[in-house]
From Swiss-Prot:
GO terms of molecular function: electron transporter, transferring electrons within cytochrome b6/f complex of photosystem II activity; electron transporter, transferring electrons within the cyclic electron transport pathway of photosynthesis activity; ubiquinol-cytochrome-c reductase activity
GO biological process annotation, one example: photosynthetic electron transport chain
Assembly and binders: The 4 large subunits of the cytochrome b6-f complex are cytochrome b6, subunit IV (17 kDa polypeptide, petD), cytochrome f and the Rieske protein, while the 4 small subunits are petG, petL, petM and petN. The complex functions as a dimer.
Stretches that traverse the bilayer: 36-56, 95-115, 131-151
Protein name according to UniProt: Cytochrome b6-f complex subunit 4
SUPFAM superfamilies named in the record: a domain/subunit of cytochrome bc1 complex (Ubiquinol-cytochrome c reductase) (SSF81648)
Entry annotated with the keyword Transport: yes
UniProt similarity note: Belongs to the cytochrome b family. PetD subfamily.
Membrane topology summary: Multi-pass membrane protein
Gene, per the UniProt record: petD
Alphabetical list of PANTHER family matching this protein: CYTOCHROME B, CYTOCHROME B_B6 C-TERMINAL REGION PROFILE DOMAIN-CONTAINING PROTEIN
Length: 160
């Protein structure tokens, strides 16, 4: 077991370095440019090479091949587009549907300006933002579930 030398805290040179914030690792190798210019590109290129190698050597199919002569009865988008699809499907005027879709991010952008006097991070002390979040989540789930149902029961989810 080696003997380590304890630093002499009465040394004025060491005290000056500690006062400047140089108490640890002022003798080491800097992260810039060594790590960022030499090590990170090697890791990134290695990751890309592994991905390309796997794609070339072992290609895998992403679902069934498309058949242009057999279309499904009802075409549904991916699951994350279900609420938007439901808005476009239920609104009779398509321009109004597009405007409703644009109103969602516009409404979310106005929430910080409505509650700009409230600096709290606690959601219970920010009632407007919490209410907008909860109502938006419920409406998005409701529209998403309704998009998977036929058009006549999509708005009521078949409950009424």
């Amino acid at each position: 077991m080696g003997v380590t030398k304890k630093p002499d805290l009465t040394d004025p040179v060491l005290r000056a370095k500690l006062a400047k914030g140089m108490g640890h690792n002022y003798y080491g190798e800097p992260a810039w440019p060594n790590d960022l210019l030499y090590m990170f590109p090697v890791v990134i290129l290695g990751t890309i090479a592994c991905n390309v190698g796997l794609a070339v050597l072992e290609p895998s199919l992403v679902g069934e091949p498309a058949n242009p002569f057999a279309t499904p009865l009802e075409i549904l988008p991916e699951w994350y587009f279900f609420p938007v699809f439901q808005i476009l499907r239920t609104v009779p005027n398509k321009l109004l549907g597009v405007l409703l879709m644009a109103a969602v991010p516009a409404g979310l952008l106005t929430v910080p300006f409505i509650e700009n006097v409230n600096k709290f991070q606690n959601p219970f002390r920010r009632p407007v933002a919490t209410t907008v979040f909860l109502i938006g989540t419920v409406v998005a789930i409701w529209l998403g579930i309704g998009a998977t149902l036929p058009i006549d029961t999509s708005l009521t989810l078949g409950l009424f």
